[in-house]
Amino acid sequence: KGKASLKQEGDKDTRIGVDVNSFVILSERDRVFGSAGYRSEKQENVLWNENIDWKLIAPYVTGDSIGGFLKGETYYFNGGYASESGSWIWGITGGYRASHNYRDKDPRPRNTASDLSFALGAGYRLGTYRLGVSADFRLYQQKSEISFLADKGSTSVYHMLGLGMDYVRFAGKQTGTKHQASGGEEA
């Protein structure tokens, strides 16, 4: 029996990696934590997506009808600190992730992505309730280039808009894109 999958994510995902985590109690009120890791990945039978982080940037992806596999690597680290003093509790966390993926057959995408994030939160104990506020910030950037090296020529590359639509103005030989976003949230 088959398994449901999105064509843009492929139908087989093979990963190998290592993760390191740490949690240290500095005192009765202070904690620090962190993690770092590396992951190597191969997605097979990917169609209509030549980008990394599809779930984050969709539906604005570059795609073609040929598709194939995508190989990639990801490195990340993050950490944080939390403290409690009387009725107050607060914490800060931050992290960075760098990824790249590619294919060594036409069409040949080469994507790099960086993802930086910070969050800060504070809370106050009021009887059996806790009132809290938090803010976070994220800076994400992705650069994508597609090349064709075979003598057979190239296929059309589409800049997808979602719901099966593409941006006709850039269809054809436009093979580079850049996704950049920053933002924050307060709660």
Residue ranges and their predicted role:
Residues 4-8, 61-67, 102-108, 176-184:
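Extracellular loop and loop/strand-boundary signature of outer-membrane beta-barrel proteins
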Residues 28-34, 86-90, 127-133:
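Outer-envelope beta-barrel architecture signal
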Residues 1, 34-40, 92-98, 133-139:
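Transmembrane beta-barrel strands of outer-membrane/channel proteins
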Residues 1-15, 51-61:
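Surface-exposed strand-loop-strand hairpins of Gram-negative outer-membrane beta-barrel proteins
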Residues 49-56, 107-113, 148-157:
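Flexible, surface-exposed loop regions and adjacent strand-edge segments
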Residues 18-24, 77-83, 118-124, 187:
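Residues on the lipid-exposed face of transmembrane beta-strands in outer-membrane beta-barrel proteins
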Residues 41-47, 101-105, 142-146:
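Outer-membrane beta-barrel proteins
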Residues 80-105, 113-119:
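Surface-exposed extracellular loop regions of Gram-negative outer-membrane beta-barrel proteins
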